[in-house]
């Protein structure tokens, strides 16, 4: 099982942060568009090749994101109205997310098979997450899903 770590900077206007492996090497670079509508986050690999694009839809009642992996739109994430805990609806072929989304502690399944999980690290400077990927062929998908939920 591969472990990756996401650490968001506390005060970053551009929304740029990295995803590192267990040896603290940059595996992915996430860059947000600054002052652009719609807001777009691009996920690139260590060779600067784009692996996914997250777009925040405009003119929606609640936040809505679409995730394109390898140029194909594969996930739509909609934040639902809720007073206390954030609630999301995820539309993706065969993808299911279970657990505590509010505490960012959840598991990801595809067609009933476990492919990864996410755990938020508390008491850190900025937001930090541990992402474990069970099926490495789905790594880009899992990282894209997590980034869409935390931005």
Locate the predicted segments by residue:
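Intrinsically disordered, low-complexity proline/glycine-rich segments
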Residues: 1-151
